[in-house]
Amino acid sequence: ELFHLKTPYLDCPQCFFYNSRALSGTLYIGIAKQEPEGAEPLMDVTENLSDEVPLGCIAVKDYSENTGLLAFLKSIGFITEVVEKRRSGYVEIPICRYDKAVLEDTPGQPGGKV
């Protein structure tokens, strides 16, 4: 399903989630904007950490240009719970449970993959 992404730094209609796996096997989730000629990647949702996150959870990048992303993801029902926060450098990364069905609900993107 397409959604209107709204954070302190971005106000962008016609967005959708896409996903893949990092070389480490960790789930990668990004947000892209649907354009007439294709998709334009906008931002990373997930952060790659040195240690594993609990099963069914992701590490959400909610700092720098992604500030406000966690609140937005909660508002659309994608993030269901923040289970912990982990320090990574100078920031704390929220570790969150998410609704997997949202990734599968992107028109024209089977399984939400680009």
Predicted regions and their residues:
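Short acidic-hydrophobic surface loop/beta-edge motif
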Residues: 1-8, 84-86
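Intrinsically disordered, low-complexity segments enriched in small/polar residues
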Residues: 23, 28, 36, 54, ...
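Catalytic phosphate/metal-binding cores of nucleic-acid and nucleotide-processing enzymes, i.e., regions
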Residues: 2, 9, 14-32, 38-44, ...
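Short non-domain terminal segments
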Residues: 1, 14-15, 76, 96
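Acidic, aromatic-enriched beta-alpha/helix-loop junctions
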Residues: 30-78
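Short, compact, well-ordered microdomains
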Residues: 62-110
